[in-house]
Amino acid sequence: MVGGLFIPFFLIIMQEVSSRRHVIIYSRPGCHLCDEAKATIQNAGCSDRFSLEEINIESDDELLRKYKYDIPVVTIDGVERFRHRVNVAEFIRLIHV
């Protein structure tokens, strides 16, 4: 009960899930900067606040053309936030916004 109203448990869970950020790392095999970016994100200490997806740019000609020389590229909720390196403090700030 909140303020005299009963809030179904599933609504609380749905709100929690919908407030998580969706992070995508565009990368390719053998990219050491991609490995560093992924490790930085995974070790940022806020993994409960986002879902992480890694996309190999070699699997899509358009992504390969777009990001060939700029990986890793990291997006948060569809907005490009980082190229080449991830600033951990800025990443954490963006996840908590």
Feature locations, PLM:
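N-terminal amphipathic/basic-hydrophobic helices that include classical n-h-c signal peptides
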Residues: 1-13
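Local sequence-structure signature of Cys/Sec-based thiol-disulfide redox active-site neighborhoods
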Residues: 15-43
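Short helix-capping segments at alpha-helix termini
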Residues: 45-49
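Thiol-based oxidoreductase modules, predominantly thioredoxin-like and allied folds used
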Residues: 50-61
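A short, hydrophobic beta-strand/beta-hairpin element that forms part of a small beta-sheet core
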Residues: 72-80
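Non-catalytic, surface beta->alpha helical segment in thiol-disulfide oxidoreductase systems
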Residues: 79-97
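Short Fe-S-cluster ligation motifs
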Residues: 59-72
